[in-house]
UniProtKB/Swiss-Prot annotation:
Renumbered ranges of TPR repeats: 294-327, 485-518, 526-559
Gene3D superfamilies, per database record: Tetratricopeptide repeat domain
SMART domains: TPR (SM00028)
Keywords (A to Z) from UniProt: Lipid metabolism, Repeat, TPR repeat
Domain of life of the source: Eukaryota
Cystine pairings recorded for this chain: none
Pfam (any one): Iml2-TPR_39
Lineage per the UniProt record: Eukaryota, Metazoa, Chordata, Craniata, Vertebrata
GO BP of this protein: lipid metabolic process
Family under the similarity heading: Belongs to the TTC39 family.
Name of the protein described by the UniProt record: Tetratricopeptide repeat protein 39B
Biological role: May be involved in lipid metabolism.
Length: 588
């Protein structure tokens, strides 16, 4: 492994960066231009891991300037979202409420008559000052963040409805701001720097809303369209790309939104076909500007994972960890990724160590972390498990008591973990079969491991050993048919990524033929139909691919991880129906 700096040696560029911002004077007045300049300084500090210094710049004017209010509250909201501590969430909500009040003071005041007239004829840009236009954008951003925190804070239905209304209001404001910007373009009024900054805000909001809404399964989107929402993926991406290529304060936010889409959404909620070339191109200038920025390093490492460069990713995650000590939550994100990195390589002992760190330090999803730790330990020989001092059965029995609710709903992966853990509730527990590899599949990790044929072959060997063990059991348990189907699904996925499509098809069909024997893991059937559909897509049989994926969509309901599969189905069908497969793809 290459040497990773412990943080005591710093580049001259970084020291120069700190010197430049060390003695930033407090402004005596704060107009829009000055606010944007000062908030840009704060943003640069934030991206260079100087989180407290960024807050110190923003705090003095947080109740007097819309951009200071937005920046200050956004950092606190990010912090609360990562810690999940109730007091941090409450602080984030309180600060965001103050930010909304600040933005409200700068918004155009309208009478009842003016408000009614605007329903018929939207107000033009001439009716708003530049400051009022920016106040609208900042208000919409604050409203969206407050709605998100409202869901996290309390699970009651009233808060859920309030949060939904805030999101809808935010969406409507963005649409109106987009109309204002379009009008300004036609009138040739977009030359000033502040107008370009407004443009950046519009592209971020409209782009993010369109992109995220386009990801939703059609049945959900139809309902949202009824109440005024709409989402166009290509339009959303184009808006974010334009925003990312600009020089506004929100350019980096457009970049981070695109990076999150390419490196997480496309993998976990999509088919795994991420545009990593664009992700690398977007990140490159920021890696040069902030070579030790933890957020930038994190995404660089994530891209390495998705490219199958696990060893390089591990080094970059370690660099990210030592780059700053103020926000430990970024360390937790790295631990999560490192856990998967080692799992993909079947280095289960190292994977366990990172799962254990998450259990001890992070509050995000204790049920998931404890289940993950127990699942990983289950892959190790008994003598190695003893050296850790852990009790696998006791860990699985803890899971149900750690489950939490957000916005009144249980977290799907936690519900899945609880259901799987119930095998260990009885006095005579029945061991789970390949639980860590099952979780790799749940998180769509085989699309990542599949980039490395050597590792995929190793995983296949592990699966086939489990298959032989199950087939030779003399006293099979009631879970035996489910376990056999799980093994066939995992085996089929490995074979598919190795290009052995006929063998993979046999495995998937074996699961489908065993449908009536499955007692507990009913999710295996729709997921298998989905995988079979993707296999036919790889073979170039578009019609058959659509038919099998539609079967997964329409013929099954009320199974574990249903929403996650529907997101993936939506992505797969959009790809198939939007761009017909003309030639068979080359197996990777």
């Amino acid at each position: 492994m290459a040497f990773v700096s412990n943080g005591t040696e710093r580049d001259a560029d970084e020291e120069g960066f700190e010197d430049a911002y060390e003695n930033i004077p407090v402004a005596s007045k704060m107009d829009l231009r000055c606010a944007l300049e000062e908030c840009t300084l704060a943003l640069n500090l934030f991206l260079n891991n100087k989180f407290s210094e960024a807050l110190e710049i923003l705090r003095p004017w947080a109740k007097e300037s819309i951009y200071h209010a937005l920046g200050y509250s956004t950092i606190l909201v990010m912090q609360s979202a990562m810690t999940f501590e109730p007091q941090d969430v409450q602080m984030g909500i309180s600060t965001m409420k103050e930010a909304l009040q600040t933005c409200q003071r700068f918004r155009k005041r309208t009478t009842v008559v003016e408000s009614l007239s605007n329903l018929v004829s939207k107000q033009s840009g001439d009716q708003l000052t530049e400051e009022e236009m920016h106040a609208e954008i900042c208000y919409a951003e604050c409203l969206l963040q407050k709605a998100t925190l409202t869901f996290v804070q309390d699970e009651n239905m009233i808060n859920f409805i309030k949060g939904g209304m805030k999101i809808r209001t935010s969406y409507q404001i963005y649409k109106e701001c987009h109309q204002l910007y379009s009008l300004a373009v036609t009138q040739g009024k977009t030359c000033s720097d502040t107008h370009h900054q407004f443009e950046g805000g519009v592209k971020l909001g409209i782009g993010a809303f369109n992109l995220m809404l386009s990801l939703l399964p059609s049945r959900v989107l139809r309902l949202l369209e009824f109440i005024g929402f709409s989402g166009n993926r290509e339009f959303g991406l184009s808006q974010l790309r334009e925003g990312a290529s600009g020089n506004s304060i929100r350019a980096i936010l457009c970049v981070l939104t695109l990076l999150f889409y390419h490196t997480y959404i496309s993998t976990i909620l999509g088919t795994g076909e991420a545009n990593l070339e664009e992700a690398e191109a977007l990140l490159e200038p920021y890696l040069k500007k902030f070579p030790n920025g933890s957020i930038i390093l994190f995404y660089a490492a994530r891209i390495d994972i998705l490219k199958g460069r696990f060893e390089q990713a591990q080094e970059t995650f370690q660099k990210c960890i030592v780059s700053q000590q103020e926000w430990k939550q970024i360390h937790h994100l790295c631990y999560w990724e490192l856990m998967w990195c080692h799992s993909f390589q079947q280095d289960w002992l190292q994977a366990y160590r990172y799962a254990d760190l998450l259990c001890k330090e992070s509050k995000w999803s204790k049920a998931t972390y404890v289940f993950q730790k127990a699942a990983i330990l289950s892959m190790l020989p008994d003598d190695v498990v003893k050296t850790t001092g852990e009790d696998i059965v006791a860990l699985f029995r803890q899971v149900e008591g750690l489950k939490q609710r957000i916005a009144g709903k249980s977290i799907p992966t936690e519900k899945f973990a609880v259901r799987k853990s119930r095998r260990y509730a009885s006095d005579n527990p029945v061991k789970l079969t390949l639980p860590a590899l099952e979780m790799v599949y749940v998180w769509n990790g085989f699309t990542i491991v599949g980039k490395r044929p050597d590792l995929t072959e190793n995983v296949l060997v592990t699966i086939e050993k489990a298959e032989v063990a199950l087939q030779s059991e003399k006293n099979p348990s009631e879970y035996h048919p489910d376990d056999l189907c799980l093994v066939q699904l995992l085996k089929g996925v490995c074979l598919k990524h190795l290009g052995r499509l006929l063998q993979a098809e046999l495995c998937f069909n074996q699961v489908i033929q065993s449908e009536k024997r499955v007692k507990y893991d009913h999710y295996l059937l729709p997921f298998t139909f989905y995988e079979l559909g993707l296999l036919y897509k790889d073979q170039g049989d578009r019609d058959k691919a659509i038919r099998y994926i539609e079967t997964a969509k329409s013929n099954y309901k009320d199974y574990s991880l249903e929403s996650r599969l529907h997101f993936r189905i939506h992505a797969a069908l959009s790809s198939l129906k939007g761009s017909p497969v003309s030639t068979p793809s080359t197996p990777q």
